[in-house]
Structures are given as C-alpha cells and as structure tokens.
Amino acid sequence: MAIKFHDGVVAPQEKSEERAKEYAQTVNKIENAVFRNNLNALFSQDEILATRLFSLGEQKNYEVFIGKDPIDINIIDKKTLSYLYEKPASDIQNMLEGLGAECKRYPVMFFYGLGNGVFYKALLYNQTHQHIIVVEPDLEILYITLNLVDLSKELLSERLIIFYSELTTYSQIYQLMIGQVYSVYAKTYNFHVHTPFYDKFADDYNRINQYFVRAISQVVASHGNSVDDLLQGVRNNTENLPQLIKGYVYQDLIKKRKGLMDTAVIVATGPSLDKQLDTLKKFAPYVTVISLDASLPILAKHGIKPDYVTSIERVIETSSFFKKRNGNLDKDAYFIVASLTHPQSVKNILPRRLVLTLRPQAECSMGLNKHGYLGIGLSTANQAYQLAYVLDHKNIVLIGQDLAFAPDGKSHATGHAFAQADENLYTTAYGGIGEVRTTYVWDKFKNQYESDIESTNKKGIKNYNCTEGGAMIKGTIEKPFVQVMEELTRGKELKNLPHISFPNEKTIKKELLQAYKFIQTKIKFEEEVKQKLEEVFLEVAPDIDKMIEIRDKGELSEKHFKKLLSITKKIDKAKEFAGRQKYRRYIEYILSISVYYQELELAKISVEPSDTTIQKVNKLAEWVEMHKYWLFSLAGGLDAEIKTTKKASKNLIKEVKKLGLI
C-alpha cells in the first residue's frame, strides 16, 4: 500500500511493483496452489513476512495431523507434545458458537494465534466482520497453516490481516489503528487468545497487547477533547490566512533546500540541553539547526544561529518566545509555524522570515496545497522532526529531548519560561537501564516520535538521540553528542543555504479569492447541516426523553419497539444528510471533535446482542439516548464554528475587497 508521509507526497511505488512482479514469478513455481495463492495475497500486506515464509527451510518443530473431516487439522509441538487443539473440529465449532456468536456484530476483532486458520475462515463468512487482525508468534505455524488452508481471498481483501509478532512494531500497530473503522471501535478492543496452546507465549502476548493499548490511546488523544481548542485553532487559522498566502511559501522553501544538507540537529528544551550547548555552537555552521519555539531564547542567549524555528501551539503564551529581536542571530532563520498559531505570534515574528504552514487535517480541504502539509502529532518536536525528514536529511540528531524529569526534578533547560506540571508516570530511561518520571503528554510526543522514526529508519535515515539523559526513544542510536558531531561533520564545508522570494501578486490574488470562496461555502454548508440537525433534534428529543423515562421506571417493553424504530429512522436520515459528500469536507473536523466520544459509545452499543425483541428494544433505547447528545453536540459545535469563522474571516474579506476581488 502507498504510504503518505508528512510532506503530503505519496511514496514512489515503482520499486515495490517491480519486487511484486519478481516475487510473483518466483512464487508461481510453487506446486502447492494453496500456499502459492496465500503467499501472493500476503505479499500485498507484508512483503517481508511473505518472503520469509517463502524462503523457510525444513520444518522441525511441529507435526501435522489431518483427520477425515477437512477441518480436523491439528498441529503438535514435537518437543513438548502440546496440541494446538484437544479436538480440532469440535473445538473450532465451540469457538464459533461461543465467541463467534458473542461477537457476531463486531466489525473489528483482534486475536493472538492463527491456529490452523479454519476458525478465521469460518468467522469471516459473517460479513459484519470487516477486519480480523491476527498476530502469530510462530513462523512455522504460519507456514503450515498457509500450506493447508486457502485464506488468499480474505488476505487480499484485508478482511484478514496477519502479523508475525517477531516483526511487529508499535509503529505498524499505530498505522493500523488510525484507520477510521479501528478508531471508532476502539472501545470494543479485546485481544483474544486463540487457544490455551498460546499461553506459553504470554510475554509476547503482553508486548503486542501493550502496542495496541498505546496505539488506541494515541489515536484517541489525537482527536482532542476540547471544542474550545478546536475553535481557537479555527479562529487563528482563518485570521492568519492573508499572511499565509502573502508570506513565504512552504513548498517553495522545501524545493529550494531539499537535499542540500546531510545532518539536522533538532534542539528541544529538556534539562539535558544545558550540557550540549557548547558543542552545538561549535558544530552549528556545518549542520542544519532546527530550534523548537521554546528553545529560541536559549539559543539566542548562547549566540547560536538556528536555520529554522518551528512552532505549532495556538495559545498566546507561545508568542512570548518570539517577542525579543535577536539581531543577526535569527535574521536568516525561517520560522516554520502552523497556521493555527496565535496572531500575536505572527506579529512578534514579523518582519522576520515567517512561513505559515497548513497541517494535514481540515486545512487540506482548502486546496492551498503549496502551503502544506506539516505537523502530524501533538508537539512542535514532532513537527520539527517531520521538517527534517521532508528536507531530505540523511541524519537526524535529537538533543534536549528528555521527555522526562531530570533527577533534580527539573522539566526543562535553564532559561526556559514554563514549568511542567507534576505527574507520576514512568518510562524506560535513556540507555535502557532503569526508569525516569514522565508525563502523559510527553509520552504521547514520544509515541509519535517512535512511529515517525521507525518509518524513516526503513528509508535509510539514521536517527540519533544525543540527549544523554531523559527517556529512551526507541529506534534511535544513543551516542554522545560531541562524538556524533565529529563523525557527521568531518570533511564538511560551511553551510550556505539559499533563500526564497515572496509569491507574485497574481498568485496571491488567486489564492486569496480561493480562500474567500472556500470560507463562504463552508459557512453556507455548515448552516444547512446545523439547521437540519436542529430540526430533527427538536422533533425527536421529547420522544427520546419519554422513552428513557419509561425505561428508568422499568416499564420498557416490546410494545415500544415500533416507536423506538421510528425515532431511529429519523436520526439516521439526519446523519445521512450530514454525511453527504458535498458537506463532508467542510464539517469533518468539527464532527471529529464534537461527537467522536459519542461515536465511541455508539460503537459499543452497536455490537451488543439484539437477538430477541426485548434485547432490540433495550439496545434501541440506548441508541436513541446517545444520539440525542450526538445531535445536540454536533449542532452546537457547528453553531460555534460558524460564529467563529464569520468573525475571524473579517481580515480575509477586508483583503479581497481592498484588491477589488469581490
């Protein structure tokens, strides 16, 4: 599958397609049609695993017993004589009647252990199961099963997704869980062990389970939990549009400087930064220096010139980092700042070189692609890392990136303006020995770092954590900063980076008009959806309240089924209206914040049993009750965004009028 990284460019697939052709030609020589078909299908999911299975030699650890019944397949460990199943056919039948029936409404299910594959083949006859994720710890069992049971159709459609646990990483699980169906059904997550045979892999099971739990937590956190924060971002982004369009263009800068430097040093503000500053000053002329916003005052104090300063925060407090002018120290630096930054930050940075950038979220829908996209994750540290990647550095070095408290309790380097609130979470220490105290937010930053680093490691980029303290960041090479700088700058010339010009007047006018039209259409469509939701809410809310009152009295019965079904149909029509393609691009972001947590609860309700009429009645009562809050929340969110956008777009309207564009 093509993977989009942070510059919004799809990774080239030519080499992958060539490998697929070569692989298919080789695999097609396999006599066993079942194994051949399975490997070809698996290759589209996991090239490395498919190749490992193809090249696997003699099987030594297991024996296979096949009875008269085609599903009577058992696998026995030769050393321990433990059986995968006691009685394969009846065990699988019991699993289908038990877990299969219990979870028959689950769109997504997770299992540890592939077994003989028959259970999953049967389970996927239920079309409700959109995806079944299976993690198998033993390569030989994978090999045996894919030789015996044809799962090619299920693998090719990705209704069955197989991971080999030895190759499985947090980044892979995170990339899986950011998918829409996985994130919505996060609260239904349960990691089922296939059979007791797999109990001997308990440590591995726990490791993979932690990956899923971390990934789910990261995905939920990325949705945010505050409409107020979202509205502040909308307000700031809309107010900043004229400056974004008239200022330096992000893609122009990337094209001009891509591949010019080999090494980037990202400067964070952890307590370990103090000891690295002298080394950084010495080697700064030979590397790209990317300063986080909070690091700028510290670098200025020590006379270190940054090449880029990144910032992603929307609050006014961040603007204080840019208040002081640093003369020659930052006159040539480009301030790469998310467009949702506070307008005061824009004022404080100017007239220095400001590049406002769009994040790969709701801003994509405006079509101002030259100004994006940068800033996946919750931190400007993640933004800086993604910038270093997009600029095509071969080496990315982190310093001051403690993501943990120092032994003396300090959370930041000397000279940093803000302290970190107390929390008692612990993570593996730098060097892998012991633990250090961290925070929930820092842990989420670290998760994003590790996901990005795993992706770039595969592309041949070397990632160094030269913080020499704080938390371990998996995937990085831990080395002393001075040693890494000496190695990477040996024989390098002083850097001499070219600058870019402002966009021409024609482009500015075109994009201002484009932004204006988008904002007007957005307001119009949001008002249409809001009106529809309010109408339906006012119509169904009294009926829902009545049904809930009856339920709470214990008087809900089968006779209420038709009424609840009628309410549900009205709600469904409202959701279908809001989900129309023409509205979706304009309301998707406010939708994701306003009702995401209701959607998580609705997903839980949707998988509850409803085999009898009374079960259906109780389930529908829960369903309509949650949708009352859903309708109210989204209508309220839209109303707030409409008002915010109208007020914030005054700058843009003034600009287009001044230029005679409307």
Regions found by a protein language model. Name each.
Residues A268, L292, I312, I336-A338, ...:
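Generic beta-strand/beta-sheet core signal
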Residues K410-D452:
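Phosphate-binding loop/pocket of nucleotide- and phosphate-handling active sites
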Residues V267, F283-Y286, I290, T310-I312, ...:
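Alpha-helix capping and helix-loop boundary segments enriched in small/acidic/polar residues
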